Amino acid sequence: MAPETKGQRSISHFFKSQSSSQKLNKDDTEYSGNIIDLTNGDEKVSSRLANFEHKPNKSSKSPNELDTSKRKSSKDNEHVDGDPEPVKKKPRTSQSLSRSKSKPQSVGSNSKKLTPLEKQFVEMKQSNLDKILAIQVGYKFKFFGEDAVIASKILSIMLIPGNIKLDEYQHDRFAYCSIPDNRLHIHLKRLLNQGLKVGVAKQTETAAIKSIDSTNKSGLFEREITGVYTKATYMGDELLTGDPNINRTSITDDEMGDYIFCIDESHSKDIGMIAIQPITGDIIYDTFNDNVTRDELETRLVYLNPSEILVINNSTEISKETIKMINIVNNKVNIIHRPRRQQTDYTNEIYNFFNTIDEGKYKDLGEHYLLKFPNNIQSCMIELIKYLEEFKLSNIFTIISNVSCFSNSKTCLVLPSSTVQALEIFQNMTDPNSNKGSLIWLLNHTRTRMGNRLLVKWISKPLIDKAQIEERLQGIEDLTFKFNHFIDSLKNQLDKIGKASIDLEKNLIKVHYSSTYQLDKISRKEVYLLLKCFDDILSMIKQFGKPTNNILESIHSPLLLRIFDELMQLAKEDTVRCLLDMISADALDDSNLNDQKIKFFNLNYFKDQQIISQLSEISNVESLLNDELIEIRKMLKRPQLNYITSSKETYLVEVRNGKMVDSLPKDWIKINGTKTVSRFRSPEITRLHKQLQYHNDMLIRNCDKAFNAYLFKIDNNYEFFSKIIRNLSTFDCLLSLSAVSSINSNYARPKIVEDKQIIQMKNSRNPIIENLSVNYSNYISNDINISYDEDRVLIITGPNMGGKSTYVKQVALLVIMAQIGSYIPCDEATVGIFDSIFIRMGARDNILQNQSTFMIEMLECSHILKNMTSNSLIILDEIGRGTGTNDGIAIAYSILNYLIEEPRKPLTLFITHFPSLHVLEDKFKGIATNYHMGFHEVSKSNQEFPEVVFLYNLVRGVVGNSYGLNVAKLAGIPNSIINNAYTKSTEIRDAIESDWPKKLIKMIKSLREQNDARVELLEIEQLCNNID
């Protein structure tokens, strides 16, 4: 067997997972994390088929049952691949795979038993061992051998038994399964969602071309791999295969699109990273210093959530720290190791790539990347280029306007992964498959997919530049409170794009890929709709003409004015109109895909000599066929005779059965017939018909070439179209934020200050809880007052479930909304600009990293203390609860004391169930202040514990009782247990109170002797916990 190639273990991993009892079915979306090591090219695949036995599912469909279209093959589509279907032969059971008594034989002595198609498969497979191959055979796609076993299991389709391995000859054919070609897209996505790489091999010649041009007229059809896909690189390409009438807009592809990562960890702390998103063309790079726990890497993985990761380093394997972190974030990601090479290799390859792609069109970009980016970014870049070449996507790096830095400290802040998760920015943590209850769920009212993607970026990276924040806020005010005909018309255009499910951003990048590599990633209809959307928008802007400037006098937002001004300038150009004039939109209404191709171009504006030449040849042949028809009319004495078409067979002469048929020349060929008539072609018609088919097929080829040339023209104007998309996306995001303040009542524009850290809000509300509540009127609002000058640290106590966590999350969410440029739920607000927001909240452990709850708690605190600034907002929830009470109090006190005395002086909200920490208010008056969540205690008889009514309002003071027994009651703990606990709690409290004088004297002695401050704090906690 051939040596292992890139990614090969992704297939062997599937068999391994089967033998280790991982069961896959049609509802599975991924399998466990897969590490692919490319350093050992000689290692062979170990698929462990001995442990895998295919068991047909009762619901599995046979290959013929799947072909619901029941299309009937014409002679034009016949093939001579020698791949017989088991029609009359009784199929063997799956057990026959293992029970066959035939002995394995050598390849050389048995290769003659393979059909021509199977030999072709073996040749393809030997050079593509890392892929599942789907091979086109007529109107079907077939999987053979190991590929068939995997495909049949995932797709729940029948497996026809046979040989599994390439060098196995126990049976007279390979095991196989098949799917109809018009269902390829659907089945392909299911395979890709299992983390597999799939190659699609198509027939590259037709019967007509083969019969005239081919040197081997009776041999095998030529096939080649026309597309290779993974989950991140597939963009609905194969929707073009099969049924031309399929409604592409009715099939929802992943709207956001997966990222592909490359990380250079050659230097353990100085890490370089590039992430590309094929569906949009986004390229995100970053360099950062990281620690052993890979906190910075985790943040980037959480934000971008890649499905494929390449890791470069100087070792023979990926570092344990990186592997652990990747598996924590996503244990289903495919991971590929790349050994680091000499830097000169990367430099030379970058130069070579840009000098050769598109005939040197982008040769200057090599110098640009080498001068602008450090070595560890250059290495990531070239490894991604090499990786993407197989998918024909590496020209993504030719669009430098799509390149951005992940952490741009001058314009935005990056929320740490712990903050993103704690605040549920993008995902509801109780239901990871839903975003309901997340910040994106609240703010996302975008009309288009491109607007949706941009809004996600806005939310993930709040602004730290006051001018940019104010521009967005003013834009929302203009859109919310002022009616404008121009703005209303532009809104309607976005609505049309959204309702039609047209993804301008995705389709434009597909044009770019296709123009360079001559791919079929985008259909003619998609191209037309793309241009038509641009034309409608620019034409609408033109219709306003000169009065546009007067209309925009009511707009005060510099951001909106820039958007409209740039769109007006772009509307003056005739680029879109010229491109639309070259095509005929009426052709797209034709249900026949080939007719669409032939009629697509308006040859008056798009002059292609090859198309014109083939059309002329076709016209000549059709004229000769008409001449032949005249001669046949004379011969048969039927002046009204015409050619007919039957079962897709054209140019047939229909004759009644009987004497008329008997009188025909013997060299006439019968094509088909019925009981009453027979249909023939004369030798001359047969000859001309073959010529006509040949020229028609050549015309289709030339139309495809012309279409690629047309895509190249569009791609030459990529930046023009990209500017339109960027402006429309920004406008869509502003409309979305405007909708938030319109749909929800009592939202206010925050006053942004940059000279001091402050959060002052009157009657503020948690925007998520407010929208999830059934009765809005019952929601309790709270004031927020925290600033650098006064009450910089809030120490918050109160009963369990009293609303402490909800309150501090509310503070963080409102700050983020303000810095996004959104209105916020309150009467009025003044907010400073924060460059970082750190949150340590919740109890969780990490088995993968052998880390306990307390270890994670301390690691996150350590990260916060190291990275905070004087412009940070810090929220700490119940620090110290992951360990014993004594150590927990000491840790909580020390951390809080450090945050108060630290010269960087961040604003801090500190939730605790250790009421003894309230002493810090006396120690640091005006800096630290005690607050608690309001409640009302309802006393009962001495035998029962008091009930608590939560008021959910923040009030001054400290609370010593957490009222945990009330939570136990809500959880359904039996009353007898709760009453017993209350009795015990009362006894302990009475014992402590009776011992108070002795404890006080001991504490004073301890202080006089200057013992450890921790002794003091522990004594205070134990004595005051029940006395306060």
Curated annotation (Swiss-Prot):
Comp. bias intervals (Basic and acidic residues): 41-56, 67-88
SUPFAM superfamilies linked: DNA repair protein MutS, domain I, DNA repair protein MutS, domain III, P-loop containing nucleoside triphosphate hydrolases
InterPro entries given in the database record: DNA_mismatch_repair_MutS-lik_N, DNA_mismatch_repair_MutS/MSH, DNA_mismatch_repair_MutS_C, DNA_mismatch_repair_MutS_clamp, DNA_mismatch_repair_MutS_core, DNA_mismatch_repair_MutS_N, DNA_mismatch_repair_MutS_sf, DNA_mmatch_repair_MutS_con_dom
Region (Mispair-binding domain): 109-232
Disulfide-linked positions: none
One CC-aspect GO term: site of double-strand break
SMART domains according to UniProt: MUTSac, MUTSd
GO MF annotations in UniProt: ATP binding; ATP-dependent DNA damage sensor activity; double-strand/single-strand DNA junction binding; heteroduplex DNA loop binding; Y-form DNA binding
Recorded superkingdom: Eukaryota
Secreted keyword on record: no
Stretches with biased composition (Polar residues): 93-113
Annotated stretches, region: Disordered: 1-114
Alphabetic keyword roster: ATP-binding, DNA damage, DNA repair, DNA-binding, Nucleotide-binding, Nucleus
Complex and partners: Heterodimer consisting of MSH2-MSH3 (MutS beta). Forms a ternary complex with MutL alpha (MLH1-PMS1).
Family to which the UniProt record says this protein belongs: Belongs to the DNA mismatch repair MutS family. MSH3 subfamily.
Entries under PANTHER family matching the protein: DNA MISMATCH REPAIR PROTEIN MSH3, DNA MISMATCH REPAIR PROTEIN MUTS FAMILY MEMBER
Name used for this protein in its record: DNA mismatch repair protein MSH3
Organism ancestry: Eukaryota, Fungi, Dikarya, Ascomycota, Saccharomycotina
